[in-house]
């Protein structure tokens, strides 16, 4: 959790292990490598008014629960958007997170980008995702997620191996469900950005991105006595910030999309 507009996260670098050369030899004490990363927390609010004569009579006796459900759904979509921004955006580093500190970049890196090649999502791109994660020594046990748009999700059905029961323990054509393939968890989001005719899909290893929450979620239903008709007010507020904490675990997957 976070309690300010700016928050930091200390990342520990990879640590190797040394061969024991002899008995009773002195320990070679090494300092673990730390890297501090900085994120920004923001507050997001929604306030909805309900006229107790007009709105309630026209819709239903108690629309409050449905409105709250819609507000929470909108809040979750915004969280997805912020996580996607953090996945491919610049990350400020340094002890104090000053503007003069060199930001950590991911864009333009061939190691962390799979070029579109004029195609949508393909078997070759999925294989490349697995290969990049392996090159970065991401453990096999770590969950790996690929975020696709609806059109890219549809393109999966054109991959024969994806639809074959020999390669996939589910039946995508029968169920219409995109879940897992080649050890990758496939999820859909319409918040992925687009550059020209290419959709910037994202693959990431669990633990490479974080969503830090600030103050506890506020929800309140009250009567606004300062307004004519004493309408009900539904108020919602959340505070959070997203941050990429590892370049090694994030890959931009460019996919052509008309």
PLM regions: where:
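Alpha-helical scaffold segments that mediate packing/assembly in large oligomeric complexes
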Residues: 54-132, 252-258
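Short Gly/aromatic-enriched secondary-structure transition segments
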Residues: 22-29
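Short, catalytically relevant binding-site loops at active-site mouths
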Residues: 89, 151-155, 192-194
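Structured, hydrophobic secondary-structure cores that serve as assembly/anchoring elements
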Residues: 14, 34-63, 126-159
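Oligomerization/assembly interface segments of phage tail-like spikes and tubes
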Residues: 43-48, 69-71, 232-234
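Sequence/fold signature of self-assembling virion shell proteins
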Residues: 3-15, 34-41, 58, 103-121, ...
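Short, solvent-exposed loop/turn elements at domain surfaces
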Residues: 16-20
């Amino acid at each position: 959790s976070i309690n300010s507009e700016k928050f930091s996260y200390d990342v520990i670098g990879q640590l190797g292990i040394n061969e024991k050369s002899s008995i009773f030899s002195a320990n070679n004490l090494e300092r673990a490598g730390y890297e501090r990363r900085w994120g920004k927390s923001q507050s997001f609010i929604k306030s909805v008014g309900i006229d107790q004569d007009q709105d309630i009579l026209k819709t239903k006796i108690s629309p409050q629960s449905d409105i709250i459900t819609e507000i929470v759904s909108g809040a979750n979509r915004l969280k997805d958007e912020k996580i996607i921004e953090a996945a491919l955006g610049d990350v400020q580093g340094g002890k104090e997170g000053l503007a003069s500190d060199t930001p950590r970049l991911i864009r333009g890196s061939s190691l962390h980008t799979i070029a579109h090649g004029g195609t949508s999502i393909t078997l070759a791109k999925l294989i490349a995702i697995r290969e990049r994660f392996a090159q970065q020594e991401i453990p096999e046990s770590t969950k790996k997620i690929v975020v696709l748009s609806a059109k890219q999700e549809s393109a999966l059905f054109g991959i024969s191996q994806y639809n074959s029961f020999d390669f996939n323990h589910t039946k995508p054509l029968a169920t219409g469900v995109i879940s897992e393939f080649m050890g990758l968890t496939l999820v859909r989001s319409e918040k992925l950005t687009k550059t020209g005719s290419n959709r910037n899909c994202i693959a990431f290893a669990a633990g490479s991105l974080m969503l830090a929450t600030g103050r506890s979620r506020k929800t309140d239903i009250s009567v606004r006595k300062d307004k004519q008709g004493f309408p009900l007010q539904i108020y919602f507020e959340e505070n959070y910030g997203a941050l990429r904490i590892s370049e090694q675990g994030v890959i931009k997957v460019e996919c052509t999309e008309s």
